[in-house]
Amino acid sequence: WRRGTAYLKHVEKEGSEQLRLTFEKGELKAVNDETFDDPIQAIQKVEEIGAAYGIGRDMHVGDTIIGIKGRVGFEAGAHRFLEKYTLSKWQQYWKDQVANWYGMFLHESQYLEPVMRDIEAMLQESQRNVNGTAILELRPLSFSTVGVESEDDLVKTKFGEYGEMQK
């Protein structure tokens, strides 16, 4: 064991269970309808539930500032799924471009560069309509997205329908 090492989770639970994650302006506010004032506590609750199924943590290999490959552990959530329903095509496109650029600059120790504040403002504003609940189905070693409930859902429209519609 080495300090700072991240390990994947082990399966402790069989079967499946639904997980409801509620976001307001892109921030996690409730887990299975239990509200949290502190987003860190909400994330810890998600980790507690997902860990039993061996999910929630993964590995990423990338390039480091000194030019060698590095491996890091990270945890991912349902936020991106909700964004697909509540952001337009171009909002998603530019958010992805800017987020990648921001991550690269941050990784290269450019946090104090003034443009970083501009990018943070853009990313923060992009979350104004990321409101609602993402519903996931958890199973051992995997999860799937089941649906979204949101007043800001761009799929539900009075204008018309295309493809499969969410009811």
Regions found by a protein language model. Give the residues of each.
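Nucleotide-activated chemistry modules centered on ATP-dependent adenylation/adenylyltransferase
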Residues: 1-167
